[in-house]
Amino acid sequence: LNREVFDIHEMIKHVAASFEGVCTQKKISIELVFATKHLNVNADKRKIQQVLYNLLDNAIKFSDPDSIITIETTDRGEKVYTAVKDNGIGIPRAALGKIWERFYKSDLSRGKDKKGTGLGLAIVKEAVQAHGENITVVSTEGVGTEFSFSLPKAAG
């Protein structure tokens, strides 16, 4: 890992902005709910950018038009939690344990436009765990999905 101190909020804004075009197209808005003005973490910038990109990409892919995706940060003790929530199709309970596997796709029949390698969440989990941290998922079919991961807060 190539750890450095950076503001997770700046990174979230940057990643969210990179999806502006597709969000406009699908009429999806991204709402940012930040714990504080600035929130520094000590992590591998490139890997965490990939984590945020993959989670947001999935949230957009599985969300209906005219919906809202929320990215929220929480400052808790030595940790910073980042959650990506959507009101999309949700993940079937039977599939929840498998979503982290490489090349796993929840159900090909659920959408022909759902392009992807099935590597996104495997990469996300590996990146978060490489930091000695965790990622969790809560999902309800037809209601939506929330992914939340922790990172070490930067000292100071």
Predicted regions and their residues:
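Acidic ATP/Mg2+-coordinating residue in the GHKL
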Residues: 86
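Conserved catalytic submotifs in the C-terminal HATPase_c
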Residues: 2-7, 24, 29-39
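Short helix-loop "hinge" at the ATP-lid/N-box region of the Bergerat-fold HATPase_c
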Residues: 59-60
